[in-house]
Curated annotation (Swiss-Prot):
Entries under PROSITE patterns matching the protein: RRM
Species per Swiss-Prot/TrEMBL record: Schizosaccharomyces pombe (strain 972 / ATCC 24843) (Fission yeast)
PANTHER family membership: OS02G0815200 PROTEIN, RRM DOMAIN-CONTAINING PROTEIN
Residue numbers bearing the Phosphoserine modification: S37, S41, S49, S86, S141, S397, S401, S427, S435, S456, S466
Phosphothreonine PTM sites in chain numbering: T431
Gene, per the UniProt record: cip1
Protein known as: RNA-binding post-transcriptional regulator cip1
Every RRM domain range: 202-280
Gene3D superfamilies per UniProt: 3.30.70.330
């Protein structure tokens, strides 16, 4: 038949013989008969499928030619009988397209190491397909050379005994499903490895948790299993949605290891839990995370300080949006941090301007500074100094009213104004504190004279401490004090 009918067919120069045969090439009637039949067209079988390469003899006996799993593509042939090949046909390997020529030639070619291999046409519906599949499942080794030669003798080109018996073939799907179930059971029951260097020995990750399972319910399973409960157990939410992931922390590595071995593979609501050790981040990543945490903490601290600062000054009645108040605060801030090379800073205002006086008082208390006033007519100078460079001759604090400050002694004014400012009052009271114009020593001396008489220890101490005082002055003062209290002189 010309090659134009089959364009895919290999074109061969018919004038030359194959395999060194100088004789005229004869057509392969068996191969042509198979190709001409539309029902017996060759089909490619998948790689790895068990094929029973078996032909039956006239007596009905069968034996496997190659009962192992075929690792290459094989051509499926039909059950139709084909004419017997001639002895003069050239052979390719241990078989021809139509099968073995005879027992002796097939045996010799099967054992030949220098032969060229060709695809083997196997029958898909052979009688012994079940035997070949069973041998393939049990990893039966291929027959030896002697066995193959004896088996090849029983083969013939006739189509007797080629009835299909596909009902006896074992199910591959059932076998694969059994292997998958066994493998999954072995993996779930396998003991996990101990924590490595890149893991945290006291932290674990629980995966594949049912989405509807609550955290308290999962902790109840810890109690039922008798395993240690973590001191920290948190569900992980991705954008507010639970994805079946949780983190647990323990005090000791032994507790974590017991939980991993017990809880791994544990089934809850039809889902098997997977427990793993929590991995550490690389050193570079950990450093980045720590820096980010420090930066966030610093930002939160600054915001909190600004919030407290704003609330405190708002309660005191100060408005930092005011230009004058903001300028006063800026100057005091620079002076408090010693950014201004000066021992003191001065503010000038009128005695009737209470806003500036109130602002300086509050800012000085906030920055821990001292201030005092220098009146000059209607102009009032407020001098602010550092605590270690204060002027001891003048009061350290200044009330809102400048006239009040100069009517009181310095120590008493300082104490009164400090207590007054701590109570939260913005301005000094209208009524000044009582003035101690009369010395206390006279009152105490009169009381001592009433008790001890002339032998008063206070009188003796005052007499010794003041040698320049005359005796007459002392007697006069003593008699005056005694008369005031109604004490007679003995």
């Amino acid at each position: 038949m010309p090659n134009e009918i089959f364009p895919w067919k290999i074109r061969v120069d018919e004038s030359r013989g194959l395999a060194g045969n100088s004789g005229t090439k004869k057509s392969n009637h068996e191969a042509l008969s198979r190709l001409q039949s539309p029902l017996n067209s060759p089909k490619l079988q998948p790689i790895g499928s068990p094929q029973a390469s078996r032909k039956t003899s006239g007596s009905g006996s069968s034996a496997p030619l190659y009962p192992k799993w075929s690792g290459a593509l094989s051509l499926a042939s039909s059950r139709a009988a084909s004419p017997a090949p001639s002895d003069s046909f050239p052979t390719f390997g241990y078989s021809q397209l139509g099968g073995l020529e005879n027992s002796s030639k097939g045996s010799a070619l099967f054992n030949s190491a220098n032969s060229i291999g060709t695809p083997y046409l196997s029958s898909r519906n052979s009688n012994s397909a079940n035997e070949a599949s069973a041998m393939a499942f049990h990893n039966v080794s291929p027959p030896s050379g002697a066995e193959s030669s004896s088996e090849s003798k029983s083969f013939s080109a006739s189509g007797k005994g080629n009835k299909a018996d596909t009902s006896a073939e074992p199910s591959l799907d059932a076998f694969n499903s059994t292997q998958i179930k066994a493998g999954s059971t072995a993996n779930s029951n396998s003991t996990p490895v101990e924590p490595g260097e890149d893991t945290i020995p006291t932290a674990i990750v629980v995966k594949n948790i049912p989405f509807s399972l609550e955290k308290d319910t999962l902790l109840d399973h810890f109690k039922q299993l008798g395993i240690p409960r973590p001191y920290a157990f948190n569900y992980h939410y991705d954008n507010g949605i639970f994805r079946g992931l949780a983190f647990a922390n323990f005090y000791r590595p032994e507790e974590a290891q017991v939980v991993v071995q017990t809880l791994n593979g544990y089934e809850i609501n039809g889902r098997r839990l997977r427990v793993e050790w929590k991995r550490q981040l690389p050193a570079a990543e950990r450093e980045k995370v720590e820096k980010a945490k420090k930066r966030q903490a610093e930002e939160r601290r600054r915001k909190q300080q600004y919030k407290m600062f704003e609330v405190s000054f708002t309660d005191q009645g100060l408005n930092l949006n005011d230009t004058g108040t903001l300028e006063t605060y800026s100057r005091l801030l620079l002076f408090a941090h010693q950014c201004i090379p000066s021992r003191e800073i001065t503010f000038e205002t009128t005695s009737k301007d209470g806003n500036l006086l109130n602002a300086i008082r509050i800012f000085c208390l906030y920055f821990d500074l001292d201030y005092y006033a220098r009146p000059n007519g209607e102009v009032l100078k407020l001098v602010v100094t550092h605590p270690n460079k204060k002027n001891t001759s003048v009061s350290q604090s200044q009330p809102a009213s400048p006239n009040l400050r100069f009517n009181m002694p310095a120590p008493l004014a300082t104490r009164f104004l400090q207590e007054h400012s701590l109570n939260g009052t913005k301005s000094a009271p209208i009524t000044p504190p009582p003035s101690f114009a009369v010395p206390l020593t006279n009152q105490l001396r009169s009381i001592d004279d009433k008790i001890y008489g002339n032998e008063s220890p206070l009188q003796k101490a005052s007499t010794l401490s003041s040698p320049f005082n005359s005796k007459n002055d002392n007697d006069a003062s003593t008699s005056a004090s005694k008369q005031s209290f109604g004490v007679s002189h003995f």
